[in-house]
Amino acid sequence: MVNILHIDSSPRAERSHSRELSKEFVSAWRAAHPEDAIAYRDLGHHPVPHVNEAWIAAAFSPPETHTPELAEAIRVSDELVDEFLAADRYVFGVPMYNFNIPSTFKAYIDQIVRINRTVSLDAQGFRGLVEGKKAVIITARGGDFSATSPAVAYDFQEPYLRTIFGFIGITDIQFINANSLNEGDARTQSLAEARAAIQDAIAQW
């Protein structure tokens, strides 16, 4: 049995392309692999807290030294990290906002990138602790940020996500980018291509 963590980050509901596509991926996977367990987290509708001063103090001090206040400050982060580490694979639905990810998803990443939980630091430098896992990241973009587009230089979304998840040890990442979703006929073609990519990804995942 494979444990999958499915996360959406769009604040939109029915009109969200990233939600629609990530749901299609998970539904198709569930149909093909009914024995697998799928956990779901909706960051768009149920955002996690941003880090604050108490969180930082707790994250960079031994748990046995925590006061009740520091223990409470880090409690949600501990729960999120536990959930994250319990998964074998990840499906993320991520819209592009201002060339990058929604702040809700950034807040989540800040909560799970934790010294001695998901990344370690020693004399040799940083080492990701989340190894041997896979991720599919489904993005939705209003414009064309594909590799052949002049606007690709504005795509800070995919490079950031590759970097931050690679930093904690997840390097087996497949992106399914739905571009040009604000462009009429191009939207229809882009969604069709994304759906085809979803089927290919499921066959290979």
Curated annotation (Swiss-Prot):
Q: What does this protein do?
A: Quinone reductase that provides resistance to thiol-specific stress caused by electrophilic quinones.
Which key words tag this protein in UniProt? Flavoprotein, FMN, NAD, Oxidoreductase
Cofactor requirements of the protein: FMN
- Family designation: Belongs to the azoreductase type 1 family.
Classification via InterPro entries: Flavodoxin_fold (IPR003680), Flavoprotein-like_sf (IPR029039), FMN-dep_NADH:Q_OxRdtase_AzoR1 (IPR050104), NADH:quinone_OxRdtase_FMN_depd (IPR023048)
The keyword Flavoprotein is assigned to this record: yes
Q: What Enzyme Commission number(s) appear in the record? A: 1.6.5.-, 1.7.1.17
Keyword check for NAD: yes
Which Gene3D superfamilies is this protein grouped with? 3.40.50.360
> Which EC class heads this enzyme's classification?
oxidoreductase
Name the catalysed reactions.
Answer: 2 a quinone + NADH + H(+) = 2 a 1,4-benzosemiquinone + NAD(+); N,N-dimethyl-1,4-phenylenediamine + anthranilate + 2 NAD(+) = 2-(4-dimethylaminophenyl)diazenylbenzoate + 2 NADH + 2 H(+)
Q: Which residues bind FMN?
A: S10, S16, H17, S18, M96, Y97, N98, F99
Assembly with partners or alone: Homodimer.
The coding gene here is: azoR
Protein name as annotated: FMN-dependent NADH:quinone oxidoreductase
Top-rank taxon = Bacteria
What binding details are noted for the cofactor? Answer: Binds 1 FMN per subunit.
Any GO MF annotation of the entry: FMN binding
